[in-house]
Amino acid sequence: MFSSLYPLARASLFKMDAEDAHHLTLRMLGAAGRTGLACALSPRVPDAPRTVMGLSFRNPVGLAAGLDKDGAAIDGFAALGFGFIEVGTVTPRAQPGNPRPRLFRLPEADAIINRMGFNNSGVDQFVKNVQAARYRGVLGLNIGKNADTPIERAADDYLYCLERVYPFASYVTINISSPNTKNLRQLQGAGELDALLAALKDKQRRLADLHGKLVPLALKIAPDLDDEQVKEIAATLLRHDIEGVIATNTTLSREAVKGLPHADEAGGLSGRPVFDASNAVIRKLRAELGDAVPIIGVGGIFSGEDARAKLAAGAALVQLYTGFIYRGPALVAECVKAIARG
């Protein structure tokens, strides 16, 4: 029923300010998840099991981080048929993010520009929300650094968050690719990334001993990388035995949206315009990584065929964000069914 009603709901939501609509949707999904209403109204999504990073996924179509930064609507999103849920990005301390307005729709391009800036309630509240959720499927927890933490001390924030979220995560995503936190993408540089992953891997081993379980780490990277940068990142992932990589985050490019309203707004562009760039990075990663490190493909998925294209490029799993906002819950089932057909 959600699927059939969504076009009407979207028409109303798209008349609202984009961020206000986002918060309203989160509140509604949070309430629906708590009451069980979401399950009653949700589309039937077939199982299409996958095992990736040593984890068992009900199906290979997940929710990308960013839609639920505080983990406040996990049960509501889970009821929509996603095979896994990723929430965050969370930082050690609560922060407001960048000034509003900071979220813009580009409906002519099926795109969104955001410069949210890791707005979140902090890792302590985040963990409380995660613990309160009833969902027991695969849950990814996405971590970042506070805006006022010097880039030279970024590892401290990631290590702190990793320790706090580790007991509650199926996997942990290291987000170093948001364009909306000053200098964050510097951490994708060879030396910076090597040092960060070495520290995180050491922390992961110690936490695994403490908690009696190894929680996989996944690195989320940008689409705005040249071939040499992708090769360096792949080599660093292999060197440190990182369990997964998510490709990709939003792009700074505006080539595909030139002349459209809001196209010149600062921030990361997501949606259809990032589809090809994301697929190109996935193909390059697969060529460098082989089967050693699984790839989660995200960026511009608006149909089942788009999801299949991500897998054909080399992804093992996919995630939805902007396509989900434009298409609604029906997109989840469509993608799962298309992938299951092979």
UniProtKB/Swiss-Prot annotation:
Q: Which GO terms describe its biological process?
A: 'de novo' pyrimidine nucleobase biosynthetic process; 'de novo' UMP biosynthetic process
Quick one: which pathway?
A: Pyrimidine metabolism; UMP biosynthesis via de novo pathway; orotate from (S)-dihydroorotate (quinone route): step 1/1
Keyword field: Cell membrane, Flavoprotein, FMN, Membrane, Oxidoreductase, Pyrimidine biosynthesis
Disulfide linkages recorded for this protein, renumbered to the chain, are: none
Topology relative to the membrane: Peripheral membrane protein
**GO MF:** dihydroorotate dehydrogenase (quinone) activity
Give binding positions for FMN. 65-69, 89, 142, 175, 220, 248, 271, 300, 321-322
Q: Per UniProt, where does substrate bind? A: 69, 114-118, 175, 180, 249-250
Compartments, as annotated in UniProt: Cell membrane
Pfam families under this entry? DHO_dh
| One GO cellular component term | cytoplasm
Q: How is the cofactor bound?
A: Binds 1 FMN per subunit.
Listed EC numbers: 1.3.5.2
The record's active-site residues are: 178 (nucleophile)
Q: Give me the reactions it catalyses.
A: (S)-dihydroorotate + a quinone = orotate + a quinol
Question: Which prosthetic group or cofactor does it need?
Answer: FMN
Q: According to its UniProt record, which protein family does this protein belong to?
A: Belongs to the dihydroorotate dehydrogenase family. Type 2 subfamily.
Its quaternary organisation is: Monomer.
Recorded hits in NCBIfam families, A to Z, give: PRK05286.1-1, PRK05286.1-2, PRK05286.1-4, PRK05286.2-5, pyrD_sub2
Protein name as annotated: Dihydroorotate dehydrogenase (quinone)
Gene this chain is encoded by: pyrD
